[in-house]
């Protein structure tokens, strides 16, 4: 028997067909969220305060310093925050110290800085009672980038861009004549030498001495002539730059100096961030640039004079190993340049310079200039960076160095929650800083306290704005646990500071070789966001700099054995190594079986001797994301269909009684465990008590832990989230074990669907175009039944005419409609409601008109009751009927926080039990989706030789052209698993081979071709051909026909055109468009067409009269002029065109004006009014009938006596 048994948690054992030993467990799948937020609380916040503070006033008398901060206990627990529509947040208190430099007085004070949202254990935030996720953003890393473009003559031209985290961009480029220019912050271009002069190196000789003689530099110097001899070259360049940046303003050297300092050399305005400084140093460092170059000078030890490398040596790995320690020193091959006193930055500049031969002309000597190992604490750019970048730029023209690929994941980084929050917090703090400065100068220095200086509004506002309305703060996808998990692991290239859909080209969206093990090449949405929204691969982690790293097993260089030592490599580090695939065969001691292996290096796949291999993949599934890793036989599916399969698993609806897949991939347990939906044990112990609401565990030290289960909670997606215990009293449970299944879980594993018996066969054409035929048993036995909970709310507000009132005394409503309401007019829990039923009775005061004498008298006698009220009750919308599951009442008296003007709020939850029905969408895990076309009685379904009816029939046409053969393999292996009564695991890229499948089929006693004779349930005759029948994991998706079906009778109209609105949410009509009109014209159906374009659309007068005529049973009147025609005429008249409408006798037809709207007949609400009058009449009749009944009964009683 192939395969071996593996335990997944305590409740499931599977036969796994994996051949590759797992050397590394999957990491915690939501740590990208939790770790990042923890970093923010521990370090990120402090960093921000230390960046902004101390704040000094303009005169330098006062300074405000940051001492410390602390987060206190949250005001609400997670559950309470959900209940009260509040935020789950904790108050932030900051200790500040105010120093008065004149008197030396120091005041310390604790200042409240607003409530700060906290992350729940599941990696989400609760904002206004709703769970939200902050999606990580994929952005270009700050650094220096070199690119190459071909001009129209086919000659390469190079460009350089220095991109900071915050601040002005610096770009270098050459034109067609090979003259080099610089652009500052996307403005007009300036000759490159002007920037060098502005840095304090004014003469041509200085520049040539520093940068060496290159063609482009000499041409640029010719172009850059000394125009105004009154100024020195440095001052002239400064003024030129100022003129380009601020055209039209008076230019002086001083103003230019301060402008350039502010643009580039002020740490508060220009910031590379540590990651940017690391990238710049790496790109401009001598180590990377000297590799494979030929030295044009002899390099010697500066202390001893010992030769390290002779002239004409080609620098390879071995020479670099000797040279490396010297290049890191501050005194090796360094040249110090002192700028003139007029320069922007007057400090001396230290560069490392080594002479090498040009690649294009081996006789020519070229300077390679490094930026001199700048300390990582310099977050802003320094002149050495600019000079080294210019040198790299010129070296590219000599064939030295390499251009950058901006889609390489070494040049794109992740901004996770912590950093996004930090950036937002910085915005708030810098706005606050301005206010503090102003207040310092206004208030009395002797008496002022930190509390009086600080205004926390901008900080609170910026945080609120980020969580409430940022593109990256998203309403969590809560359809099932996999959807939640994927949402937390999502990477988006959109959002502030990222790309936009329209501008993103093909390259950005494409799969790049560096995605391997970092971002899933399969899971991405279809449509305009394809490739811009990605998912983190299963083993990937994000490092401190924000680059995605993936783990590899180290290969020992001397023995060439694969060790269990794991290294996490970022994309740019990985480029230096040769990496073998995870499925390379190994001996028991870790040595490779074969002498050559398949391996990767950069974008090449090569067959290479094992001596060259540096690393080996950890696992075959490290390439893909969690959702993709849930697809068995992924390797047999076409990638487009696998993409659909991965995306559709997230849309599976949690069923009443789910079952984990018979054929899994072994990741189901980990996915369910880390999603945060299962109930996890925190300390080991023994289960002491279990019921549906709580589990109690007695720890080994004697203390008791109580775990509350989540019962029938409405999720973000309107699904039913419910937990069920899976442990028994007396069980010993370990730390981190699953105590209770969440929605779409079974036995601690993900269970998105069921395992029905599936046949690939046609049946009377009912599975044409991917339609699905299902057995009535699936409906009757609630196999695909799910519970959906919808929330409705009603508020009683104060209006201008008086407060609204919740009551059961509603005008014109019979007693029958009120039977389930309590004395306050609120529906009881457990009542069954249909469309249009009242949930909360509410009346709103109407406008009071002048009362007549009789009405005044009645008013005086009966008090308020005679006042006019309008019925504004909350009713069940179309398709919303079900059973009242819960009612929550919030009032001011109970201390609930309500928005201003609201006196009372009622929330009603309606649960619906939805069975599978015609029109529902279903799918497997291989992108094989379809809608249910017919539900066939069990006795009519085809059946197997043993009498088992088939549950689902799929069209065999759906397989060949789509190339998702994985579903067929799953079907056959599933049949074997069903017969053997076991669960199986076939991990992606390392699963069951065809030999394993055939062996399992033989073992299970299924026919050798894995097909079966199938009999027609209606006639009992066998079908001609043998049919593939087996078990496939099939899901019901959240696109249900109940949510989409919709029919309009009388509904709202658009205000201007008076045509019916569109869409289910607006209770709109179906658009009868241009092409539909052609169809009726082609048939000559003139009257049908006329009524569609008039009564049924926007003939305002006509439709009211028609409604009346139908109600009264009179003939329908002639149609009038459609409103949209009148709108067109009015628009033309507004343009000043004299436009009239004439009839056949050339008489003008009067078009009604908007001012005529007082006329009852043509009012927009006329139909509703008419309907209301009819309803009132009917209600009166009903009331009279009710009144008549009791008197009859009393008469009858008298007769009996």
UniProtKB/Swiss-Prot annotation:
Residues 1165-1201 are annotated as: Disordered. Its EC number is 2.7.7.6. Keywords: DNA-directed RNA polymerase, Nucleotidyltransferase, Transcription, Transferase. It holds the Pfam family RNA_pol_Rpb2_1. Residues 1172-1189 have a biased composition (Basic and acidic residues). It comes from the Bacteria. It is an enzyme of class 2 (transferase). GO terms for biological process: DNA-templated transcription. Residues 1191-1201 have a biased composition (Polar residues). It catalyses: RNA(n) + a ribonucleoside 5'-triphosphate = RNA(n+1) + diphosphate. One of its GO terms (cellular component) is DNA-directed RNA polymerase complex. One of its GO terms (molecular function) is DNA-directed RNA polymerase activity. PANTHER family: DNA-DIRECTED RNA POLYMERASE I SUBUNIT 2. HAMAP family: RNApol_bact_RpoB (MF_01321). DNA-dependent RNA polymerase catalyzes the transcription of DNA into RNA using the four ribonucleoside triphosphates as substrates. Belongs to the RNA polymerase beta chain family. The RNAP catalytic core consists of 2 alpha, 1 beta, 1 beta' and 1 omega subunit. When a sigma factor is associated with the core the holoenzyme is formed, which can initiate transcription. This is DNA-directed RNA polymerase subunit beta. It comes from Lactiplantibacillus plantarum (strain ATCC BAA-793 / NCIMB 8826 / WCFS1) (Lactobacillus plantarum).
